């Protein structure tokens, strides 16, 4: 019986006091700043999108669901969960974008390219 109590006490102590080293902290932000390239018009623009609101820019409708910044003590990075629609094709993108690795998961289609710049 005493062994079980000691074992339980040790588990509780180490379970509470030991913190994994891989803990990531993120700062939730209110806006996503994205760069949009309109290939047909040959222009790029930087647009600030509020979270959870449909924002229409040219032929695109963008909705940023979540935007976060990495811990300020780590290398600065930003992540956004973005949904992009066109009136003709419906949803053309839904997923996470990573600012430090723009080639990992950007929107690249015939008419537009979209990249994350930062979160504010």
Regions found by a protein language model. Give the residues of each.
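Bacterial N-terminal signal peptides
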Residues: 9-17
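N- and C-terminal low-complexity/disordered segments
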Residues: 2-4, 21-120
């Amino acid at each position: 019986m005493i062994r079980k109590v000691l074992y339980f006490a040790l588990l509780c102590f180490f379970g509470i006091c030991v913190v994994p080293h891989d803990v990531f902290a993120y700062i939730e932000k209110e806006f996503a700043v994205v760069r949009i390239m309109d290939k047909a018009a040959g222009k790029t623009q930087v647009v600030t999108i509020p979270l959870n609101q449909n924002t229409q820019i040219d032929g695109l409708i963008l909705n940023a669901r979540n935007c976060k910044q990495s811990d300020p003590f780590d290398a600065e990075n930003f992540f956004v969960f973005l949904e992009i629609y066109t009136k003709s094709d419906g949803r053309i993108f839904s997923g996470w974008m990573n600012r430090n690795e723009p080639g990992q998961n950007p929107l690249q289609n015939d008419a537009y390219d979209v990249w994350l710049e930062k979160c504010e």
